[in-house]
């Protein structure tokens, strides 16, 4: 008789990029991709893992891009935050269809649409086995959703921030442009800063470093990768002190 292996993490913060939701469409939300991600999250919940999620908004609007086009950066960032709420609602709906209880908590009050972010409520929901989707970034302009992921991860005392990307982890160079680039298995925060590796923006990364929040970068497009990460198997790149 085999005993079921236990997950390596009890509580995680999963950071998904908005682009991940668009699939091959190039814009918006691909329902097939959304449903697949919901199923992967469901697997974790069934393992007893507590899951917090932060989703970007780049598939709909990106504040920095709008600012480059001449829009006021604060207005652009507000639009970006609302895009993350739209993605969060879509993810909650996909989870509900997969029979997973989920709540969207927004850093910007949107009465009648989703709940306001509340730290104590979030912890309680997670303990009860519900997935909590943190929307609207940090609620402030000039902060990325990577910053929001690290902030919420630290607040809810997650064991790790899992950054889902389109590549297998952190490489010595851009693996798309350079096929010879090598994948790092483990890195320290100092390594990342000294080598100027693009893991996440500096504000987000230094926040994680200062609070000793481990970050694991992995490929969400790889079937079963999320489960393998949570089970403590070799997948992606782990960044720790």
From Swiss-Prot:
GO cellular component: cytosol
Activity regulation info: Allosterically activated by GTP. Inhibited by UTP.
Record keywords, A-Z: Allosteric enzyme, ATP-binding, Cytoplasm, Kinase, Nucleotide-binding, Pyrimidine biosynthesis, Transferase
Entry's Gene Ontology BP terms: 'de novo' CTP biosynthetic process; UDP biosynthetic process
Subcellular location: Cytoplasm
GO molecular function: ATP binding; UMP kinase activity
Residues the entry annotates as binding ATP: 15-18, 58, 62, 165, 171, 174
Metabolic or biological pathway, per its Swiss-Prot or TrEMBL entry: Pyrimidine metabolism; CTP biosynthesis via de novo pathway; UDP from UMP (UMPK route): step 1/1
Catalysed reactions, semicolon-separated: UMP + ATP = UDP + ADP
Highest taxon listed in the record's lineage: Bacteria
Residues in the signal sequence: none
EC number, UniProt record: 2.7.4.22
Subcellular location, principal: cytoplasm
Region (Involved in allosteric activation by GTP): 23-28
One protein family per Pfam: AA_kinase
Coiled coil: none
Quaternary data: Homohexamer.
Functional note: Catalyzes the reversible phosphorylation of UMP to UDP.
Family recorded in the similarity comment: Belongs to the UMP kinase family.
Protein known as: Uridylate kinase
Organism of provenance: Vibrio vulnificus (strain YJ016)
Lineage start: Bacteria, Pseudomonadati, Pseudomonadota, Gammaproteobacteria, Vibrionales
